[in-house]
Amino acid sequence: MVLIDSSIWVDFLQSGHEPQLVQLLGLQEVLTHEMVLGEVAMGSEDQRKNALQLLPLLPMAQVADHVEVMALVDRYRLYGRGVGYVDVHLLTTVVLKPGMLLWTRDKRLRAAARQLGVAFMPVLH
């Protein structure tokens, strides 16, 4: 399963073109997260409308609690690296679920996901 970050959803909702995401959706390999839904819903009116139609239909990843998030931050020294609290929530969710990966275009979040061995690496076309 792949947890899709808001950076991927925003690009997809704007362009409608993300072949690998379409493929993952068809294979039912996509998860969303309540914080991703919230972030994407804060975009433009059209983006918000599309996000609120699509994302709630997808399986929702279990949300990590604050203690789990902070433990991951401390264990992997994720502070001071430009990775935000929402980002660390996504990382924690993925780390706590073996086999789950995180797909993002955010450079710092992707670097942290790589460090933790949970980065989804799309096939380039």
Regions found by a protein language model. Name each.
Residues 7-8, 35, 107-108:
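Alpha-helix/helix-capping structural signal
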Residues 1-32, 41-53, 118, 124:
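Short, well-structured N-terminal submotif of metal-dependent ribonuclease cores
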Residues 57:
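Conserved nucleotide-sugar phosphate-binding/catalytic loop shared by glycosyltransferases and other
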Residues 12, 19, 60-123:
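Active-site neighborhoods of divalent-metal-dependent phosphate/nucleic-acid chemistry enzymes
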